[in-house]
Amino acid sequence: MVSFKQVRVPLFTAIALVIVLLLAYFLPPRVRGGGRVAAAAITWVPKPNVEVWPVDPPPPVNFNKTAEQEYGDKEVKLPHWTPTLHTFQVPQNYTKANCTYCNTREYTFSYKGCCFYFTKKKHTWNGCFQACAELYPCTYFYGPTPDILPVVTRNLNAIESLWVGVYRVGEGNWTSLDGGTFKVYQIFGSHCTYVSKFSTVPVSHHECSFLKPCLCVSQRSNS
């Protein structure tokens, strides 16, 4: 019989053997049952590929289409808004004023024989017809023509926007109380428009009940 005193194991081998025994004891989970000890094996699973975007991205939205053309329904049901198409009619009581007046103390700017006003209070787009008509004598809700629009936007700061009187009824052309036809960057089936600091044409809005200042105008007298 060989005693342990007679067995000579190199120091490095002894240390390695101790480490292996410790790892075998502590690392694998121990499953006890029926007097046996089973070690659970560790299996490495490669990380699955995660696609951050579909292979075929969705087609872009055609903003020149109405909601009915785009989605086959006259109403677009989204969590926070539901625009209904082609329901707008010009209020009969609010038309272009046939008189002259200019409040030189309150106008925002004057240009080409007209006085322009940005209302101090905010209104819905439909409410701008009444707000402008009641602002001062001879004022009405104005749709800026291409020569007037740059002057309007220069008087806005970078975060401002305001409702303008460019609209359409049904599938008709975009127009205003002054008449004519307007080019509009349109979305869905909206009938209301606004402009901001960097607008080059009026832009239709998906929610005409938002509150914004209104663009009003009155003709100046020649005297």
Swiss-Prot record:
One of its GO terms (cellular component) is membrane. Residues 1-8 are intravirion. The record marks G33, G34 as: Potential cleavage. One of its GO terms (molecular function) is carbohydrate binding. It comes from the Viruses. The chain crosses the membrane at residues 9-29. Residues 30-223 are virion surface. It is a single-pass membrane protein. Changing Y107A: Loss of HLA class II binding and fusion competence. Changing F210A: Binds to HLA class II but unable to mediate fusion. Disulfide bonds join C99-C138, C102-C115, C128-C214, C132-C216, C192-C208. Gene3D superfamilies: Mannose-Binding Protein A, subunit A (3.10.100.10). Forms a complex with gp25 and gp85 via its N-terminus; this complex is used for invasion of B-lymphocytes. Interacts with human HLA-DRA and HLA-DRB1. Plays a role in virion attachment to host B-lymphocytes, through binding to leukocyte antigen (HLA) class II and subsequently participates in fusion of the virion with host membranes. May act as a tropism switch that directs fusion with B-lymphocytes and inhibits fusion with epithelial cells. Additionally, hampers T-cell recognition via HLA class II molecules through steric hindrance of T-cell receptor-class II-peptide interaction. The C-lectin type domain is essential for virion-induced membrane fusion. Belongs to the epstein barr virus gp42 family. This is Glycoprotein 42. It comes from Epstein-Barr virus (strain B95-8) (HHV-4).
